[in-house]
């Protein structure tokens, strides 16, 4: 580091807590002109399991996050995200623009603009999404859980009396290679005033 730039690196060589087995995982970053550029990596020996590059900008009480689409890797595979993706978070405000991760027919979207929602919300929408895509980070050699996720999970009114609405199916659900069939989550808040 000097008076203008700050660079850092932190990571682990290996962490084993059965069935979790993290291999070489590290975070590198550099701060320049109030912009923090982060590079998160996880490797299984020589294979890149996970790679996410992003930039964070702090402006007063607001945090802006952008995920770089170049070399976005989840579960050893290249993924796509729109170049103009943007996440803005403040004390009582969040906005997720074009935060849509996709690969072939798999999609995961985080949004604050789900059409059927009438109150402030933050939602995660799944389409043909394989659970192992994220869980491979915790054990790249053995599937902790598998299944195809469809549906949505929404946090309602996240800055006050928070509630939730969820309609998720996980088809062909397995945990540690044990088949469990279909898992369904269908939940909604009775009244937002019951929370808080």
Regions found by a protein language model. Give the residues of each.
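Interface amphipathic segments
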Residues: 1-196
């Amino acid at each position: 580091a000097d008076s203008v730039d700050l660079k850092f690196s932190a990571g682990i060589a290996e962490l084993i807590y059965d069935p979790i087995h993290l291999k070489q995982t590290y975070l590198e970053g550099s701060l320049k002109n109030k912009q923090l550029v982060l590079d998160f990596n996880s490797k299984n020996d020589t294979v890149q399991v996970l790679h996410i590059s992003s930039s964070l900008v702090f402006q007063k009480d607001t945090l802006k996050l952008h995920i770089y689409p170049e070399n976005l890797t989840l579960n050893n595979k290249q993924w796509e995200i729109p170049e103009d993706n943007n996440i803005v978070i403040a004390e009582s405000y969040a906005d997720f623009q074009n935060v849509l991760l996709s690969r072939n027919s798999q999609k995961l979207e985080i949004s604050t603009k789900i059409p059927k929602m009438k109150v402030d919300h933050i939602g995660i929408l799944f389409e043909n999404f394989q659970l192992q895509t994220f869980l491979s980070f915790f054990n790249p050699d053995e599937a902790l859980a598998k299944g195809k996720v469809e549906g949505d999970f929404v946090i309602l009114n996240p800055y006050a009396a928070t509630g939730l609405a969820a309609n998720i199916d996980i088809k062909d659900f397995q945990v540690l290679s044990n088949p469990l069939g279909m898992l369904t989550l269908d939940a909604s808040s009775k009244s937002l005033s019951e929370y808080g």
